Amino acid sequence: MKPTLVLVGRPNVGKSTLFNRLTRSRDAIVADIPGLTRDRHYGHGRLGLKPYLVVDTGGFEPVVKSGILHAMAKQTLQAVDEADIVLFIVDGRQGLAAQDKIIAEQLRKTGQKIILVVNKTEGMPYSSVTAEFHELGLGTPCAVSALHGDHLGELIDFALEGYPYEEETAAEPGQEKCPVIAIAGRPNVGKSTLINTLLGEERVIAFDQPGTTRDSIYVDFEYGQRSYTLIDTAGLRRSGKVWETVEKFSVVKTLQSIEAANVVILVLDAHHEISDQDAHIAGFILETGRSLVVAINKWDGLDDYQREIIKREFERKLGFLSFANLHYISALYGNGVKGLMPSVDAAYAAARAHIPTPKLTRAMLAAVAKQQPPRGGMSRPKLRYAHQGGENPPLIIVHGSMLEHVPQTYRRYLENTFREVFKLKGTPLRVEFRTGHNPYAGKKTPLTEEEARRAHSRRRRNRKKYG
């Protein structure tokens, strides 16, 4: 097991910057704004041969008893319970604050191993920058600069000292990868509630306020004896409504998380009509080629008439998602949630399907025999064979002649045929048409010696005859 390091401290002391340094990534959003990180954020790091897990937490406000700051404090305490080592971060430039004393007292009650880390110490002598923090009674402080990376190696060495570790074995060549699932949708549609229902614990903040999740949270879990990684993305809203710079960062992280996923569960709100923004999110998922499962949330409490309206609206506005499995769920009460994971598995398998060339060609020729492509001018396109050109999503390449004249309707006909024959449910499917190259096109055929002699004789006769 990897040791777990949890970063704790009051707002804006540099926890997310330290997280990015320790994981050698830019997975946590960093800006000079207090209260930026709200959920637990997990990342992997390594010092030499020693791997470790790092958990970034929101700014700790233990004295707040209600609202979202209280929920953030609960998240921090849950992370501390999971920790092997707690890195208590304080600000060396601002000095010891009253809130630091309150947090230190709270951490002492947990009984966990605590290391006091004085951040933002670049250019400052150790003795002067750490002197006042001895008052906290947490042992010798470690002075670091997360921004510049100073003394971080010594910090991790000290934190992992005496901790047993095992060398990680490489994955077997045929070993199946862990599917990565992104939960995406507009703000406040119930994405975090859905994750908590799937996990059976309150892992991410579920709060009735749009924009609660600002970062993309990675959570490993097992379901049905299979391992998965879930990503709770920040809610996407129209760019015109993205006022805060931080929220713009969150949108970028959301789009990156969708690109990093194998399967995306698109969550829609049954209590609000399907908007253009829902369609834009779905369009982006398709552009990136990610497999898709659609979940219409908050289905409970609707009567039959309202449900029928929602179904018709989905067909009208999101009909291009007909390839995806559609589920009507209540994330809050768990209704219909169990059906999501089989659809995720099916979509993941379809995206990684390997289809032999003979089978693809037979399916294509059977479709052509059933319905010929329409003529393009004086000639009809000829489809000769098909093969798979890629996966995730599947790419099928059709070869033939005059294929530039194949209309869009016939392309969709072939796509639907391939999807039906090979059961490619839940994944986008791309079909490319390639016309065979004629190496002699636009070139004159050279004359043989005999043909050249006869041509010369004809020209001489014509000159004599016509002067």
From Swiss-Prot:
SUPFAM superfamilies given in the database record: P-loop containing nucleoside triphosphate hydrolases
Residues where GTP 1 binds: 9-16, 56-60, 119-122
Disordered as annotated region, ranges: 434-467
Domain of life: Bacteria
Keywords: GTP-binding, Nucleotide-binding, Repeat, Ribosome biogenesis
Binding site for GTP 2: 185-192, 232-236, 297-300
Segments forming domain KH-like: 353-437
Keyword GTP-binding: yes
Gene Ontology molecular function: any one: ATP hydrolysis activity
GO terms classed as biological process: ribosome biogenesis
Positions of transmembrane segments: none
Zinc-finger keyword on record: no
InterPro entries per record: AAA+_ATPase, G_ENGA, GTP-bd, GTPase_Der, KH_dom-like, KH_dom-like_a/b, P-loop_NTPase, Small_GTP-bd
Residue ranges of every copy of the EngA-type G domain listed in the record: 3-167, 179-352
Bias kind Basic residues: ranges: 455-467
Family membership noted in the UniProt record: Belongs to the TRAFAC class TrmE-Era-EngA-EngB-Septin-like GTPase superfamily. EngA (Der) GTPase family.
Function of the protein: GTPase that plays an essential role in the late steps of ribosome biogenesis.
Protein name: GTPase Der
Source organism of the structure: Nitrosomonas europaea (strain ATCC 19718 / CIP 103999 / KCTC 2705 / NBRC 14298)
Gene behind this protein: der
